[in-house]
Amino acid sequence: MSLVYLLIAILVIMAMILLMSKRRALAKYAGYIALVAPVISSIYFLIQIPSVAKLQYLSTSIPWIKTLDINLDLRLDGLSLMFSLIISLIGIAVFFYATQYLSSRKDNLPRFYFYLTLFMFSMIGIVLSDNTILMYIFWELTSVSSFLLISYWYNNGDSQFGAMQSFMITVFGGLALLVGFIMLYIMTGTNNITEILGQADHIKNHGLFIPMIFMFLLGAFTKSAQFPFHIWLPRAMAAPTPVSAYLHSATMVKAGIFLLLRFTPLLGLSNMYVYIVTFVGLITMLFGSITALKQWDLKGILAYSTISQLGMIMAMVGIGGGYAQHQQDAIASIYVFVLFGALFHLMNHAIFKCALFMGVGILDHEAGSRDIRILSGMRQLFPKMNLVMTIAALSMAGVPFLNGFLSKEMFLDALTQTGQLSQFSLISMIAIVFVGVIASVFTFTYALYMVKEVFWTKYDSKVFTKKNIHEPWLFSLPSLILMVLVPVIFFVPNIFGKGIIVLALRAVSGGNHQIDQLAPHVSQWHGFNIPLLLTIIIILLGSVLAIKVDWKKVFTGKIRQISVSKSYEMVYRHFEKFATKRFKRVMQDRLNQYIIMTLGIFMIIIGYGYIRIGLPKVHQLHVSEFGALEIILAIVTVTIGISLIFIRQRLTMVILNGVIGFVVTLFFIAMKAPDLALTQLVVETITTILFIVSFSRLPNVPRSNANKKREIIKISVSLLMALIVVSLIFITQQTDGLSSISDFYLKADKLTGGKNIVNAILGDFRALDTLFEGLVLIITGLGIYTLLNYQDRRGQDERE
């Protein structure tokens, strides 16, 4: 099956979900219909593993805009296969989990699952794209679908603000990424990613190479919540928990990492890129791990832990990026080891973090709270979630016999080996190891502290008063399956390492097939060494800090803390107030004022053009022959136009305005343009009738008395506009001996199959204009339809 067919299948499922929204009896099954999408894609990508392992990459190319080299280029290699499997398999768990989480009585299920399937479609589109512009389109589509999912409970103020904040930051990064893609096109003349990576040596010597890297980093850091662009992720926790489990732990936040991995053969050629990504990742890891301890909301803890873990992966991507410069050197194996660790932890993080979010969702759903100050001794009420969250949290902390331990060991090993790499000095290595270890200590601390406070403290019935708690098996099933994978991967890591991660490494290395020999063999025991010693230190210090320190009291002092999020919110509110004031000053609900402003700006632009280039000399002027009929029609039009200024009755004004339109129809007839005359007649008739019918249903509010100053402004604008239009007509006739474009249209209209030049222009020569005019009418119609069918919906933020 072609990659295009897979995307079409997902779109068909989305259409089915949308249709179900019209039938309330079927709406409750929307989740199970949507579940088909990740199941189909999972089966498809699993089947492709043997082909990709044999280097039989699947690719599809459909021409789209050839002149700009924008095509529907899709390619399935090892890297896209790994990410597609994560998106699809985690998608199955999340979609099924959502069927138990959401209520068919209180939630609009078709709308939710349409948004969720749209997001999955967008993410798969990103990882399969082999064209930069196509990747950008899918990139922004993830931002749009994420906005819709975060604001799903739209009556909730936190949901609205979180959705807007995440949208603004990620779209800003997306626009920066688009600039980077355009720079790549300027440097290479192609938008095809495979071809671009093949010209890496040429690109690195171009003057736009460094600016392009900065644009890429902005796109990646905003999408993957790296400091200081991390602030949108905690706010996004206002979304339903299935959204947090899918978008904000396993998929969307990994898009920035995917981008850097995909372009590592190019970006890694710059040492600056290696430094920036490594240090931003470590700073983000440290900041996220410390800030997680300040949170009382379980989803807040997981949000900052996600930021921290993404920083850890990003740091490894940065260190390993140097492989692009040292593919043939003896130290190449170190870079490959680091990149392998990044991909391995990316997979592990998706599993244990998704399980943690699901556990928190069940606690919130059944206990009605996520506050660790209220939840205590929950192991008695939620034994299954106690098991799930404890194992997943310990895996995140890097405890032995769990998958997170293996990738955390690889991370620590990577830090200690940076001193052997040409990009880092001994001092740099010491700083990197220090920051990485401190961040890991705090990671262990918040992971252990979270499960201790929620499950292993004494149950207090005075604080937690809710009764009749239950823990449904179907609700718990997805998180239990993910929990089982955590120790399984620890005991058989090389099934995933050799079967999936090595295939991804081939793509990250730029197609170097010798990567198979350089890829590490993951072992549970690798002897007493520095990484193991660091792990023991981390576990001991983290345990002491988690057990002995009451972090609820540590961060409740009166010390004023600097918050990036609060700074953003302050700036956002300031600009919002500023914009509101200016908006009220300009938008005063007076249509004629809007028209005057619009025409005034137009006249200023034209006037500036006249000043810059000067008025052209009139050396030829073509005036059509006119007779008595044309003179009479012109006099009638001018007379009615002037009279409209002084008439105060609305109905009379509408009728006279219609008369002007009918006079224009007679002009077209006199000039032998029957098509235009018929069109003008129909439009004018319908418009006049609609105006009359509308006014007959509106209150009879007389037009205000004429204001001399206002009328003078109107007349002045009208006369100036008329003068400009006439002058533009004169200018178009001054050809200076050059051939007119009109001659081409007059001669080529027969080639289009049109009966006359007007039809040919509308249907062929300016077909895109006509198309978009039609789209404007369709959008207007949809807007009117929405207003007519609007019902005030409340209670969308309520959950069972």
From Swiss-Prot:
Location in the cell: Cell membrane
Pfam families found in the cross-reference section: MbhD (PF13244), MbhE (PF20501), Proton_antipo_M (PF00361), Proton_antipo_N (PF00662)
Ranges that cross the membrane: 1-21, 33-53, 78-98, 118-138, 167-187, 207-227, 241-261, 273-293, 300-320, 331-351, 387-407, 424-444, 472-492, 527-547, 595-615, 627-647, 651-671, 676-696, 712-732, 768-788
One Gene Ontology cellular component: plasma membrane
Lineage top rank: taxon: Bacteria
GO terms for MF: antiporter activity
GO BP field: monoatomic ion transport
Keyword Cytoplasm: no
Keywords annotated in UniProt: Antiport, Cell membrane, Ion transport, Membrane, Transmembrane, Transmembrane helix, Transport
UniProt topology in membrane: Multi-pass membrane protein
UniProt KW Nucleotidyltransferase keyword: no
InterPro entries in UniProt: CPA3_Na-H_Antiporter_A, MrpA_C/MbhD, MrpA_C/MbhE, ND/Mrp_TM, Proton_antipo_N
First-listed, main subcellular location of the protein, grouped into a coarse class: membrane
Alphabetized NCBIfam families for the sequence: PRK12646.1
Record's subunit section: May form a heterooligomeric complex that consists of seven subunits: mnhA2, mnhB2, mnhC2, mnhD2, mnhE2, mnhF2 and mnhG2.
Family, as annotated: Belongs to the CPA3 antiporters (TC 2.A.63) subunit A family.
UniProt protein name: Putative antiporter subunit mnhA2
Organism, as annotated: Staphylococcus aureus (strain MSSA476)
Organism phylogeny: Bacteria, Bacillati, Bacillota, Bacilli, Bacillales
